[in-house]
Design a protein with these regions (language model features):
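Short, glycine-/small- and polar/acidic-enriched structural segments
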Residues: 1-143, 147-154, 170-174, 179-180
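N-terminal low-complexity, intrinsically disordered segments
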Residues: 166-167
Length: 204
């Protein structure tokens, strides 16, 4: 969610209709870098941002956690899954074996893929992991840059649909309830939460 999409409608409606001003806030909506808003918020360059519950796990744990906290869910369920062109024959996680997958190289991401593939009777070691350079899912799939991509349906899936791509898709939440985590979430800088609770509450 590093580019504006329908998941962010509420933020833009609040800005356009003056809800932020009514709450005594001056809100500037800025474009996050392609690697997400997390580092921007952690550095204090933004008070709030959009992230994902699963990707947060790797950087809020450990000996030097990133100083951010999820304060709200934008969507109550996980709307993500794996999309591929129909002619690749990937209708289930097991069938990802023998095909390429665009990975963000995150431990939790790859752990989810491994669990899904193995639980479905597939061989995770045969899933060819390619470091993801995907910025346009339609182009990446239609030109065979990669066979399968982890997407969030609310925009990337609809984008592929609008482009007329003939695709297969399976959602993680349908595979195992444990994967029905919040996506996406609103995060805040921990220092901001501690120092200005009233502002955070007003923003929400």
């Amino acid at each position: 969610d590093w580019t504006p999409n329908t998941n962010h409608t509420g933020v833009y409606v609040a800005a356009e209709r003056g809800y932020y001003k009514e709450a005594g806030l001056e809100v500037e909506i800025v474009q996050a870098p392609e690697n997400g808003a997390d580092a921007l918020v952690a550095a204090g360059d933004a008070e709030f941002g959009v992230s994902f519950q699963d990707t947060m796990a790797s950087y809020v744990s450990g000996s030097d956690p990133m100083p951010v906290t999820a304060i709200a869910a934008i969507i109550q369920h996980n709307t993500s899954g794996i999309i591929s062109m129909k002619d690749k024959g990937i209708t289930s996680p097991a069938e990802m074996a023998g095909h390429t997958y665009a990975t963000w190289e995150l431990p939790i991401e790859q752990g989810v893929i491994e669990r899904c593939v193995e639980a479905d009777g597939g061989d995770f070691s045969k899933v060819e992991m390619i470091p993801s350079t995907v910025t346009d899912e339609v182009t990446a799939l239609s030109t065979d840059q990669v066979d399968s991509i982890w997407i969030y349906w609310a925009w990337a899936g609809e984008k592929c649909k609008l482009a007329g791509l003939d695709t297969n898709y399976f959602a993680f939440a349908d595979i195992d309830p444990v994967f029905d985590f919040y996506t996406p979430v609103i995060i805040a800088n921990n220092g901001v939460i501690e120092d200005d609770v009233e502002m955070v509450q007003a923003f929400m």
